Amino acid sequence: MDPAPTTPSRPPGSIRRTSSIDTARPDGLRGDLFITARARDLRTDLDGTASVVGEAELDARVDGTTRELRSLVTMPALPALDLLIGTVVGPGFRRRLADEVPREQEVGSLLHLLLDDLPGAALVSGYALQRGGALEDLEPRAASPEGSTAGAAALGVRDDLCAGWAHDATMMVTIRTRGAIPMAMGPPAPILEPPDDPWSWHEMPPLAPHAMRRRRRLDVLPSTAPETAHGVDVHFRDSHMDADGAESVVHEYSVSGAVEGVEGRVTAMAARARVLPWMECPAAVASADRLIGMPVGELRTWVRREMTGASTCTHLNDTLRALGDVTVLASALDNTDAGDTPGV
């Protein structure tokens, strides 16, 4: 497994959705989590001309201990989002989001993509604490009896959540026997922005030491005729910046597939594991083909409900859920009026 060395060129007649969520703790590793998130939709015309059809931003502060949302500022502004203040950015957050701003998911907005991805980004940000040594005095070190789950319980984890956390996988065995979560070290993160394409990604600020970045790219390719399949090409990466300014990959997947028809039914889907922390993790890629035959409009709900357990991966699931926006993006390819495009 190797990380992607760069980003592919933008095919003429395509639309590209990119997003990034940076998580940092400027007040120290035990301090609050500051989140900076950006997203953009970019259409590439047949002559190669690039045009921005939508942008969104958010800045948030999350309590470093309770994970409660302390502040949230978004562009575009949505007053209803004030009701999320005090909500734990974890289990239940997406359900609360759907209750307060249901239309954002319905229209596949960029802002919804960022908000929906906050729980995953906040969860993964804990890796920075581990790398920085901030968890060492919090982890119980006594080994548990063979076959016991006491060590896992003490660390607040439950086995069989995903392929990497399966009961007999490296992660859980180490927790049971050593009373500590093992630390994975990923490869250096190649720069994804090709020097010959300034439009390949939206602008992102420099990543601070001990910060993490979650970035996504979704390319929807032109169909060859009305109601024929749109190809999709997807990339996902979690990365960490260490104290010395070296960025490494924590998780990385690529996904390819096809979506066909007015309702956007999945006709092909395959995932590739590029970088994953444990040797058991790549087994989850086989779960991607479960989406074949599904309408993409149902993916966000269906994947969250049905794709659970040791044959799946939380991060791959979120990548597959984001395909729920494909039909909305595909409609922009045939829409010459930027004011009607879905990105804002």
Q: What would you call each of these model-derived segments?
A:
Residues D2-P190, H240-V344:
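Active-site- and interface-proximal helix/loop "cap" or "latch" segments in soluble metabolic
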Residues A169-V249:
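Long, positively charged binding patches that form subdomain-scale interaction surfaces
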